[in-house]
C-alpha cells in the first residue's frame, strides 16, 4: 500500500483529555511514568491526562506527525522540526539536552581498524526509511554524525562509500502494534529493547561484513554493542570539547500544537508544571531517576544510566545555548533536504508557558509554606 493510501487513526478531539507521547530517552516525561505528578496537575483542573497509546483509536503516527491537536510530545529533535517546517505549526515549549552524546563510529572489534583515516575507501552504512509519511530521523542522525566525524578527521563523504539500507518502516498502524498500553515502557514488556536488533538495524550488516562501519549513539547503544564483544568505537564525538558536535537527534524537545497553545494555554502550562516538578526531583535523586529511565532507555544498565544522566539538567529549559543546538539540527535538515521549509527557531520557541508554569509553582509553594504557619483569621476581626 502506498503511503498516500495509509489510513491514519486518532480519537475525536476532546479538550477534557490531554495525551502525551515520548521517546525512550532521557526526559522528565519518562521519569514521570513512575511518579505521576503531571497527571495529578491535570486532575486538579478536571482534565484527563493519558499516554497517547492508552486508547486503541490512536495509532503511532501522532508521535511523528502530531496529527492530534490535544497531544504534547517530548522526544527526539528531528521529527518535531519536520512537523513545524512541513506539516503543521507547533510551539517549542522546552528542551532537555544530553551534552555528551554526539555519536560514535563503530567497527568490528577484531578488524585491523583503529583510526578514522583507515576507513578511506571503505563502506559505511546508512539507513533509509521507505515511509514518506513520517520523518526519517534515524537516517538524519546517522548522516549528521558520519559527516561530522569525517570532518573532525580531515575527511569528507567523498573519502568513503555510503551503503544505503532501505527498510519498510511501516508498523505504525499495524493492528498487532495497537494494543492499548497505559505507559510507554509497556511496549518493552513485549520486546527486550536493549537486545532487540530492530532498534539497531545496521548492526547485523556490520557484523556480517556487508559494511565496515556504522554510526551509533554515544553511551546509549554504544555500550550495549560493545558489551557483545563484537564491536568497538574508533571515534566518539562526545569526547570533544566543542558542544556544537553533540547533536544526535537532541536536545529532546517538548512540542504542542498551535491550536492547544492558542485556545487552551492553561493545558500547556499545566503540563510544564509537571515537567518542572519531576525534573527538579530527578535532579535531586539521580540514582532513583536512573532506575526508572533504565526501563525505557538504551543505556547498558542502571549504573550506566546514572553515569549518563549525572550531569544532565532534567528540568526543561529554553536556554540560549540549547536553542542554538536546536538551530544546528534544523540547519542540517534544511541543508540536506530533509525539510522543505526553513523557519526561525526563536520564533518557534514559546518560553511564556515555561515562565508561567514556574511562577505558578512558586506561588503555590509560597501559599502552602505561609498558609501552614498563619492562624485562621477571626471573622469578627475581619469585620
Task: List PLM regions with ranges.
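Short, solvent-exposed loop/beta-turn-alpha elements that line the ligand-binding surface or hinge
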Residues: 39-44, 240-244, 315-321
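Short, surface-exposed acidic
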Residues: 44-52, 155-162, 266, 297-310, ...
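Conserved C-terminal helix/tail region of periplasmic/extracytoplasmic solute-binding proteins
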Residues: 2, 334-383
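Pocket-lining segment of extracytoplasmic ligand-binding domains
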Residues: 171-294
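Second-shell loop/turn segments in exported
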Residues: 25, 130-136, 259, 279-280, ...
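Short, glycine-/small- and polar/acidic-enriched structural segments
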Residues: 3-175, 375-383
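Short beta-strand->loop
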Residues: 91-99, 161-165, 230-248, 344
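Secondary-structure end/capping motifs
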Residues: 262-340
Amino acid at each position: 500500500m502506498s503511503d498516500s493510501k495509509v489510513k491514519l487513526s486518532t480519537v475525536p478531539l476532546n479538550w477534557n483529555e490531554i495525551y502525551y507521547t515520548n521517546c525512550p530517552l532521557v526526559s522528565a516525561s519518562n521519569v514521570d511514568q513512575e511518579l505521576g505528578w503531571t497527571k495529578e496537575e491535570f486532575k486538579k483542573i478536571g482534565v484527563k491526562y493519558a499516554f497517547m497509546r492508552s486508547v486503541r483509536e490512536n495509532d503511532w503516527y501522532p508521535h511523528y506527525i502530531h496529527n492530534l491537536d490535544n497531544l504534547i510530545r517530548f522526544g527526539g529533535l528531528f521529527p518535531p522540526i519536520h512537523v513545524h517546517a512541513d506539516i503543521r505549526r507547533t510551539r517549542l515549549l522546552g528542551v532537555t539536552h544530553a551534552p555528551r552524546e554526539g555519536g560514535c563510529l563503530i567497527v568490528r572489534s577484531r578488524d585491523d581498524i583503529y583510526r578514522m583515516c583507515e576507513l578511506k575507501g571503505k563502506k559505511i552504512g546508512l539507513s533509509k526509511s521507505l515511509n514518506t509519511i513520517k520523518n526519517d530521523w534515524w537516517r538524519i542522525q546517522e548522516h549528521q554524525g558520519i559527516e561530522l566525524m569525517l570532518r573532525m578527521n580531515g575527511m569528507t563523504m567523498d573519502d568513503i562509500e555510503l551503503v544505503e539500507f532501505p527498510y519498510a518502516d511501516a508498523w505504525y498502524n499495524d493492528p498487532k502494534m495497537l494494543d492499548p498500553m497505559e505507559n510507554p515502557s509497556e511496549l518493552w514488556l513485549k520486546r527486550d529493547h536493549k537486545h532487540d536488533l530492530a532498534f539497531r538495524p545496521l548492526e547485523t550488516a556490520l557484523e556480517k561484513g556487508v559494511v565496515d562501519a556504522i554510526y551509533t549513539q554515544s553511551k546509549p547503544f554504544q555500550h550495549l554493542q560493545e558489551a557483545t564483544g563484537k564491536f568497538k568505537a574508533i571515534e566518539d564525538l562526545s569526547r570533544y570539547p566543542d558542544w556544537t558536535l553533540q547533536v544526535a537527534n537532541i536536545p529532546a524537545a517538548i512540542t504542542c500544537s498551535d491550536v492547544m497553545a492558542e485556545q487552551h494555554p492553561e493545558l500547556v502550562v499545566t503540563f510544564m508544571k509537571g515537567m518542572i516538578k519531576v525534573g527538579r526531583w530527578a535532579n535531586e535523586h539521580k540514582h532513583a531517576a536512573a532506575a526508572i529511565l533504565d526501563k525505557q532507555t538504551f543505556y547498558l544498565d542502571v549504573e550506566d544510566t546514572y553515569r549518563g544522566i549525572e550531569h544532565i539538567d532534567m528540568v526543561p529549559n529554553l536556554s540560549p545555548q540549547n536553542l542554538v543546538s536546536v538551530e544546528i539540527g534544523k540547519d542540517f535538515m534544511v541543508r540536506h533536504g530533509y525539510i522543505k521549509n526553513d523557519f526561525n527557531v526563536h520564533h518557534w520557541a514559546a518560553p511564556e508557558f515555561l515562565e508561567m508554569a514556574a511562577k505558578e509553582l512558586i506561588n503555590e509553594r509560597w501559599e502552602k509554606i505561609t498558609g501552614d504557619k498563619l492562624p485562621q483569621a477571626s471573622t469578627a476581626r475581619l469585620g
